[in-house]
């Protein structure tokens, strides 16, 4: 979304300067650089527009806005914790940066000051945008692909003297809040497009001529542009103006068109410069382009030019171009392309795939493998699909690459026994039957033709044997008639010739004995008569009465001619038997009825379910049903009866997780609450909760049902078990420890991250200590550091002799030549320009002088220079100066040798020898002392005493040398170590030539 940064007064420390002629206002402020990876409020998704009431209407007690909603989210703000880093220093989350902004007086209305910048990226390359310090932070870019720092918050605080008619106008986007007299007068919160506001101070009830506080807060939280536009008539205070009318100016801002607007150095280096009220206002080097798909290019020494936008990416499988409609690069994927190291390989024939070469610089064709290892198929590829066409009449052989194809089905091609060749094997159509004549016809079909065995003799039987062929057997009882044979095979049916011997006729044999209860027949083929009695047959007047079911036998009726039925009786007069006649044999069946009890000769009681037996009543006149008793006396069983094929089986199933009590069964369904027998009443169950207490205060103990699993969850990652309560540390810079009374206390660590170097800025980030060096700073002896500005190296800030204050020492550039004009440049370089027409006077012998030093430090009295000698403090070291006995340069000598204790700071060297000056200018706080450890001065606790190689004198032990090794007992905290445990290294003697 488009960003228009709205700023008036920037950041925490805010000095606004104003001149008599009202040319400019200089705004000094503090900016807090944030990043989306550390605070999700920045680059938040969505655009919700202007959202009011995100902060309370009255400024907080610390001079910053108060978030509306505590720990609850609102639109693009997550909670109070994330909002805290907007306007407060939170190490590890944000970075503070000082910046200025200059408002210019209006030419048409001297009471109005304004500032406008449509590319206001105030901290590009700084803070989290500095890749030399934060290489892993993401780079955010504008619509043209240029990297910028889009995520920061600023605050500004000042006073103004109210006058009637005062106004304050601005336009911009994202969060802006303005407080006048601690009351909110502008409320433009949220991520939004450009929004404007105007404040008429006459409506605020202010008193003319009276001073009021003015507090301004702004956050830029989203890509992709940044603008600022300000107009105000407020009379902000300024203590001093220079001759150019610049508030707190240095007198160098006056300019002319020649050295500003038309300066070729600016133009050829892509810098826009313009004189405004004698101030040369310059921009950062920047080249723009208004044509789509082009960008501005700055060539130092030449100027701006327009070049096509480079849309080529590292993917060789995209079609890279610039879309002039949206003025943006687009990368269209190339179908069927493989991205190689230096080229893209495109496959157009899917049967011949394009792949990367081994070095990635060219493409290689890889034909698709369609071999199915079947020698009876034709393998081809079409559009990347393998096609396998079957070869008709083909047989795969076992040999390599062998397939045998048959073209004549009567003479097929088959595999040889070894499978390595094809042989012709004529088709065998014989079925092994001598009665068939085999042959093979077209298409490989077998034909079997029957053999003709007819011998033309009617009284021979012509047949064929599958093994011997045709057989001609004489036919017995054959009468040869005219062209026909009449053969008697059954003498119950004799064959004779009729019709003049042209046909045969059959004459049946008669066999009747006149008895209706016999079956008369002729026995073939012998022709003998047979008279068989009919079983169970009664001859009733020539009629047959045959009994087939002896339960229903047939007898002659009263007339002696017809048949009558006489049923068989089988009653045994027992009510518990089933009486029946068994057909057809007529046997009586009196089967006992299972489970039947005879109550009398008529009534029987039958049990069909053995679990519910049927018995006779007491007087035997009726049947009574009862239940089988399966009770086992156990309260933790389910008792039942089961009918197993007529047998009653008692089932006593145990109830799981049940305890058998005297009068009840107690069943547990949730093992977090076990059911047990009551100790006082055997008919009652008691619930006993599972004890999951692990005895630790830093865990939350619970039972997970129904399985009864104990859970012990830590209440915090860093928790200490103290006597009376758990102690939780949430901030590594403020650890919580156990107090003497067993309760939690905040551990007081004085100067936790203080490295005792007054030329560093020490902070605790929650992860570790950070020590940022202060450029141009020197440590003094008594607790201060003196910093020389980088733009004023001619005025060195040096330590006073006592080390408790800073002195300004002007760099001496006098070259003792009367014919040069001597001056010092701001960079600290002396410049000695010859004076035209000047004649150098003859040399005159004079007393010795003290040569200038690179530090410009004057002479002071030193601790141990010989009497009559002076010294210079050069980079914190004493250099003694011996006066010259004759004219010329004094002689520089070394400082004092031996040891020193410094000035009331307890400084001393390790072994009492060596260079004492390493600690002489190294200041340590109370309770700390300076020690030279391995040739480096360090502030360590007063109880520290470490040895080094000078203490051991390994050379006195013979052919030995000394090594410094890591101390295994070293304690890194300078507040917790004592004696040897404060030493990082300890010396050991080893034979020469030995290596660690």
From Swiss-Prot:
The PA14 domain, residue ranges: 105-250
Signal peptide extent: 1-21
Glycosylation sites: 79, 117, 323, 396, 428, 474, 500, 645, 779
Superkingdom of this protein's organism: Eukaryota
Gene Ontology CC terms, in alphabetical order: extracellular region
Transmembrane residue ranges: none
Keywords of the record: Glycoprotein, Secreted, Signal
A Pfam family recorded for this sequence: PA14
Localisation per UniProt entry: Secreted
Similarity comment: Belongs to the prespore-cell-inducing factor family.
UniProt-listed PANTHER family: PROTEIN PSIB-RELATED-RELATED (PTHR31137), PROTEIN PSIQ-RELATED (PTHR31137:SF5)
The protein's name in its UniProt record: Protein psiR
Natural source organism: Dictyostelium discoideum (Social amoeba)
Highest classification ranks of the organism: Eukaryota, Amoebozoa, Evosea, Eumycetozoa, Dictyostelia
């Amino acid at each position: 979304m488009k960003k228009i940064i709205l700023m008036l007064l920037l950041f925490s420390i805010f000095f606004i300067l104003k001149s008599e002629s009202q040319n400019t206002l200089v705004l000094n402020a503090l900016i807090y650089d944030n990043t989306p990876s550390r605070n999700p409020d920045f680059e938040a998704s969505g655009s919700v527009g202007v959202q009011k009431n995100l902060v309370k209407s009255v400024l907080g007690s610390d001079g910053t806005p108060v978030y509306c909603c505590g720990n609850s989210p609102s639109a693009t703000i997550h909670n109070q914790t994330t909002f805290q880093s907007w306007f407060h220093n939170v190490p590890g989350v944000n970075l503070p940066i000082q910046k200025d902004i200059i408002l210019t007086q209006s030419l048409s209305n001297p009471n109005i000051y304004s500032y406008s910048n449509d590319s206001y990226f105030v901290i590009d390359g700084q803070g989290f945008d500095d890749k030399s310090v934060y290489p892993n932070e993401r780079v955010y870019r504008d619509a043209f692909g240029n990297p910028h720092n889009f995520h920061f918050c600023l605050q500004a605080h000042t006073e103004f003297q109210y006058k009637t008619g005062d106004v304050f106008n601005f336009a911009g986007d994202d969060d802006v809040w303005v407080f006048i007299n601690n009351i909110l007068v502008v409320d433009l919160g949220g991520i939004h497009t450009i929004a404007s506001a105007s404040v008429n101070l006459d409506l605020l009830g202010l008193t003319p001529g009276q001073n009021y506080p003015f507090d301004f807060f702004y956050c830029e939280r989203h890509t992709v542009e940044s603008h600022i536009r300000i107009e105000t008539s407020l009379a902000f205070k300024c203590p001093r103006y220079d001759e150019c009318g610049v508030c707190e100016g240095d007198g160098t801002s006056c300019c002319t068109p020649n050295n500003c607007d038309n300066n070729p150095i600016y133009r050829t280096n892509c810098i826009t410069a313009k004189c405004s009220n004698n101030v040369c206002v310059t921009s950062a080097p920047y080249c723009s382009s208004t044509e789509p798909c082009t960008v501005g290019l700055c060539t130092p020494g030449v100027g701006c030019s327009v070049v096509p936008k480079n849309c080529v990416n590292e993917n060789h499988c995209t079609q890279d171009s610039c879309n002039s409609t949206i003025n943006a690069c687009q990368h269209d994927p190339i179908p069927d392309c493989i991205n190689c190291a230096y080229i893209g390989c495109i496959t157009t024939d899917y049967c011949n795939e394009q792949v990367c070469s081994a070095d990635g610089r060219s493409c290689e064709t890889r034909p698709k493998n369609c071999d199915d290892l079947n020698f009876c198929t034709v393998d081809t590829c079409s559009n990347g699909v393998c096609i396998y066409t079957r070869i008709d009449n083909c047989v795969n052989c076992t040999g390599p690459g062998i397939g045998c194809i048959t073209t004549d089905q009567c003479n097929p091609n088959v595999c040889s026994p070894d499978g390595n060749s094809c042989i012709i094997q004529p088709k065998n159509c014989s079925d092994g039957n001598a009665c068939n004549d085999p042959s093979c016809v077209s298409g490989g079909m077998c034909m079997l033709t029957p053999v003709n065995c007819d011998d033309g003799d009617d009284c021979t039987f012509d047949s064929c044997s599958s093994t011997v062929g045709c057989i001609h057997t004489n036919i017995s009882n054959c009468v040869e008639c005219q062209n026909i044979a009449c053969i008697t095979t059954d003498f119950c049916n004799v064959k004779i010739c009729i019709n003049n011997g042209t046909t045969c006729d059959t004459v049946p044999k008669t066999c009747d004995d006149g008895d209706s209860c016999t079956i008369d027949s002729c026995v073939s083929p012998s022709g003998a008569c047979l008279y068989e009695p009919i079983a169970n047959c009664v001859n009733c007047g020539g009629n047959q009465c045959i009994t087939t079911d002896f339960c229903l036998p047939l007898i002659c009726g009263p007339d002696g001619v017809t048949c009558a039925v006489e049923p068989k009786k089988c009653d045994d007069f027992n009510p518990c038997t089933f009486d029946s006649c068994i057909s057809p044999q007529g046997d009586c069946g009196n089967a006992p009825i299972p489970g039947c009890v005879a109550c009398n000769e008529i009534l029987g009681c039958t049990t069909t379910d053995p679990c519910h037996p049927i018995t006779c009543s007491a007087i035997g006149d009726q049947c009574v049903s009862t239940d089988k008793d399966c009770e086992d006396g156990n309260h933790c069983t389910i008792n039942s009866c089961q009918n197993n094929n007529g047998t009653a089986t008692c089932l006593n199933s145990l109830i799981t997780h049940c305890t058998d009590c005297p009068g009840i069964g107690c069943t547990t369904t949730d093992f977090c609450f076990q059911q047990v027998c009551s100790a006082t009443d055997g008919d009652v169950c008691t619930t006993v909760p599972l004890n999951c207490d692990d005895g630790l205060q830093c865990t939350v103990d619970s039972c997970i049902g129904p399985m009864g699993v104990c859970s012990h969850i830590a209440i915090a990652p860093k928790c200490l078990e103290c006597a009376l309560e758990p102690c939780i540390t949430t901030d590594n810079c403020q650890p919580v420890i156990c107090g003497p009374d067993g309760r939690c206390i905040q551990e007081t660590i004085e100067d936790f991250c203080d490295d005792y170097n007054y030329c560093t800025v020490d902070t605790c980030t929650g992860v570790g200590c950070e020590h940022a060096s202060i450029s141009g700073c020197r440590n003094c002896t008594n607790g201060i550091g003196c910093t020389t500005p980088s733009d004023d190296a001619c005025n060195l800030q040096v330590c006073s002799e006592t080390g408790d204050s800073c002195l300004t020492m002007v760099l001496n550039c006098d070259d003792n030549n009367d014919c040069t004009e001597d001056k010092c440049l701001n960079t600290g370089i002396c410049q000695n320009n010859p004076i035209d027409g000047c004649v150098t006077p003859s040399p005159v012998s004079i007393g010795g002088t003290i040569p200038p030093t690179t530090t410009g430090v004057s002479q002071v009295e030193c601790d141990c220079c010989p009497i009559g000698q002076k010294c210079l403090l050069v980079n914190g070291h004493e250099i003694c100066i011996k006066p010259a006995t004759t004219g010329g340069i004094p002689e520089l000598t070394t400082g004092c040798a031996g040891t020193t204790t410094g000035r009331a700071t307890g400084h001393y060297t390790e072994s009492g020898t060596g260079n004492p000056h390493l600690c002489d200018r190294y200041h340590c706080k109370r309770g700390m002392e300076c020690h030279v450890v391995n040739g480096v001065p360090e502030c360590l606790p007063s109880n520290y005493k470490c040895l080094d190689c000078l203490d051991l004198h390994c050379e006195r032990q013979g052919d030995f040398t000394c090594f410094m090794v890591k101390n295994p007992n070293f304690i890194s905290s300078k507040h917790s170590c004592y004696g040897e445990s404060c030493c990082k290294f300890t010396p050991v003697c080893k034979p020469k030539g030995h290596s660690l």
